[in-house]
Structure formats: structure tokens, C-alpha cells
Amino acid sequence: MSTQTEPKLVTQIDFARAGQITPQMKEVAEREHRDPEYIRERVADGRIAIPANIVHIKKGMRAFGVGEGLSTKVNVNLGISGDKADAAEEWKKVKIAEDFGADAIMDLSNSGKTRQFRQQLIDETPLMVGTVPMYDAIGYMEKPLVKLTKDDLLEVVRAHAEDGVDFMTIHCGINKSVIKSFKETGRLMNIVSRGGSLLFGWMEVTGNENPFYEFYDEVLEICHEYDVTISLGDSCRPGCLYDSNDATETAEMIELGKLCKRAWAAGVQVMVEGPGHMALDEIAANMKLQKRLCHNAPFYVLGPLVTDIGVGYDHITAAIGGAISASSGADFLCYVTPAEHLCLPNAQDVLDGLMATKIAAHAADIAKKVPHARDLDDRMGQARRKLDWDAMWKCALDPVTGKKRYEESPAATEGTCTMCGKMCAVRTVNKIFEGTTIDLGMED
């Protein structure tokens, strides 16, 4: 009789490979109108991730699936900044994210009581919570960047895992080989990833390999213990159109593909992060290349922004790219606000960025034929045909703004709006089919 104990099942991928459907898989299946076995199979082979830290599950989080055949998810970035440390303002942003349909919140706090804010966020929000431990490392360890050790960085990763973070962006792919390519490529915008630039600086000063790459197995051990999904950060994403699809971006993507396989072998769920800035005609091919190189792992992208000159309107430039990227294979969109490249976004910026990204994600889901993606659109068409404004608000992605604008400009003719008033095409045709006389030159 064998005395060898069976390995402990901890992560969603562990259970999926053992043929077990978890409550989280069932929840995702119900929300996505999929069979639970469809979800289990794709979690098992890494095509779907369910970022759900075991600590956060106990606090009542909702389960969200990211990946193949599922609706495109949307993330909101927020957090306390050193130049504008206002926790109350950040909590307003959390409320907006929850009320207006975000699926995830990334806490990018890098100043002040970061752990207190993070813990309270995880206690209170049912959404997925992500972080970037590298942002927190300097303040958490109370050391200058170049004095941080491998053990310091792993301690920060563990602290975030213990707090209940569901997914962590960790820049594991920027190793010495990728840096060599970066230096030889001659980029216009160099490295625009904040976490990636910090690691590049640390590596240049110390002469050491990226500790997240060199000690990747130890990172995976922590992630497995708490079922943290590792979101492999793309340090060398293009920060302008000129740099898109260059050798450096591709070199790092190849490394990220290798790291995907190592994570899956360790029973850790994975997502891979992508661009960035990219011309419209390059996006679809880039999505397909990433899926190929990273073995169909869920792809999490920032836009991409399709022009570099939309300053003040980058929620629009990113939404255009986001619709293309998500319809071409990306699974998760990080929102971009009108404040991008300019300042810390305020609450209105967050709403504008979230809605632009939600629209992009929804448009992509219709194109991808995600089950029931078009249901609300069809219901909206029916409501508009009937001029049923209350029904329209129930279909709208942002019913608050729509209703507010409508009521601010009341029409003289009941059931219409001030754009057309009595000449409303829908009203006219309805009256014809109802057998009502139409005479736009006189009162009805």
C-alpha cells in the first residue's frame, strides 16, 4: 500500500485538472451562459483564469472568468498617489467602479498607508482586486530602490497574497536577454512601464538578474499557496506607435510564453499583459501573435491607444483600440481615462474611462458572438421603437447619464426628445401603423 499522500488541491487549476468543478467555476458558468464543464476544461489548460484568492473568497467576492469564449472583462485602476494622497477621493472611484459595471479594481497605491487601503478594499469589494507589488516595495520595506533584495521583494508579494489580492502584475519577463535587445533596438520611448522601469533601474545599478525572473519558482510558490493569479507584466510594451511590434516587445513576449508554461506546471493561474500604443492595422495581428506565443493564456491589454496625439481624449483612443483588440482575441481590458499622460484621474475621469472601455468590451463581445451579448441591444431597439424611455434606461450601460441628459432638455411633445420633437421618425411611423392621422403642419 502506498504511503504517498495525494497533493493538496488549492488553486482553481488544481481542482480543474483533478476533474472537480468548484463553486467559482459554477458561478462563472452561470454568469457566462456556459456549461460548467466548458469552464473547467479551459481552466485546466490555462485558457480561462478565475482570479480568486482563497482569502478574498471567504470575504464574499464574486467569481469572474477571464479568457476564451467569455465576455470581455474591464478593470479600473485607482490608488493613493504620493503627489495627491486623498484616500476619500479613491473611495469615490471604488464606488463608481462597483456601480457602473467594472469587473476588477487594481490598487496601484504607492504612497502612505497602502496596506490599510488595500486590506479595506479587499474586505469591502466583491470585484476582483489586483495589485503591482513592485509599486509598493519601496514604501513597504522603507528602503531605497537599489537596496531592495530578492527577499524584500518576495516579502511584499507574500504580504499582498496574505491580504487577499486576486491577481498580481509581476514583471518577470524583463531579464538580461530582453534588456540586451532593448538597448540594441533604439526605441523612441524606451521603457514606459512603471514597474518595468524600476526593475530595469535596479538591474542596471546592481548588475544582477531580475529577481522576479531568477527566483520565479519562489514567486509561484506564494501564488499557489493563496491561489493568486499571476498577471505577467509587459515591461517593454510600446509607449508610442513608433515602438509597436519591435524586437524588444517580441523578445519579452517570448519570455512570457515560457513563464506561462512554468506557472501552469506549478498549478498557478496566469494572465499575460499587452500593449500599449499600436496603430490600428497592427492590432489584430499582435493579438494573434501573443495568443500563439503565450499558448492561449488570457490576454490583458491597455487599450491599445491607436494614436499618440489624443491628449485629453485618450479614453477614446484606447476604446477604439480596445474594441479591435478584444474582438481579435484579448480577454481583459484595462481602462484608460481622459487624464492619461496628464495627471491623476478624478472621479469623473474614472467614470468616463470606465464607460468608454465598457462600450469597447461590449462591442467586441457582440463581434465575438459571446452568448447573449446582444440581448440588451435588441431590448433597447424594442424600447426605442415603443418610445418607452423607462425601458431604455434599464438597457443602457450608463442609465444615470442618459436619463439626466434627457430630463435636462424636456420636449414639448410627449414621448419625444428635443432633437426631433414632433418630427420624431419613430413617433411618425408608429402613428401611421396605428392608423392615426399625421399632419405635421397642424396640431394632432
Q: Regions from the language model: what does each represent?
A:
Residues 180-207, 238, 242-244, 344-444:
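Catalytic or ion-coupling anion/metal-binding cores of large enzyme and transporter domains
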Residues 3, 11-309, 313, 319-332:
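Alpha/beta enzyme core
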Residues 3-6, 313, 349, 405:
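Hydrophobic alpha-helical segments with strong N-terminal bias
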